[in-house]
Amino acid sequence: MTLKAVFFGSIGSFSETSRLQLDSFNESMKINQIDEIWDEKEYIGYLKISGGINRLKSILSKQMDENILQKIHYDKTKIFQQKILKSRSLIRPGFEQLCEELLANNVLLGIASTTSLQTIENILLGLKSIKISDFNFIAHSGTVNKQKPDPQVYKICLEELNVQEIESVAFEDTTSSLNSVISAGIKGIAIPGNLSLNQDFSMAQIKLNEFSDIDFKGLKELL
């Protein structure tokens, strides 16, 4: 089977941002006068819920109006984007090298995220050896109306790149997001971040610590 496309899913699959996001949630809740502070141990559990707004709805919805939740998420996104721009490159080690090898073998690259396009682009500003334009399609919050683990984002990516499920693989960093891959019929690769290491990735084809643990040949063998 020919490997035609590789998808990188949630932003955590190609960048390390979990602690920045935790800080951003806490700052946003403080700004909005919410008497709650999440610690790292709590947030590790919350990462099992895909999508920032879903996280807020699941944890705070019993005591919050929908408009307040949306405002907290909006402020969190703004704060997070500012933190990204102030940080040195957040790109995970080996990501660009793997992308270079895939590009050299004429494999299409896609990002299957449901976060904002601005956030994705801000993170990708940290790229050095490849360019944002090297990605053939970038799915974002404006592309979908369903959050992971719903497979919608992956089905859209497959259609946009005109590839079949069996011709592609996808990287994800959390169990919930990986379920989106599996539901779309794509072979899923787990590459957990610092705060999702202990999640159950038994449904993955393979679990990696870093991108350097696999290459083009290894990805082809997963099909």
Model-identified regions with their sequence ranges:
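Ser/Thr-glycine-rich phosphate-binding loops at phosphate-binding pockets of nucleotides
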Residues: S13, T17, S113, S177
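Substrate-recognition element of Asp-dependent hydrolases with the DxDx(T/V) motif
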Residues: F25, F95-L127, V181
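Residues at secondary-structure transition points
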Residues: L47, N67, K86, L90-P93, ...
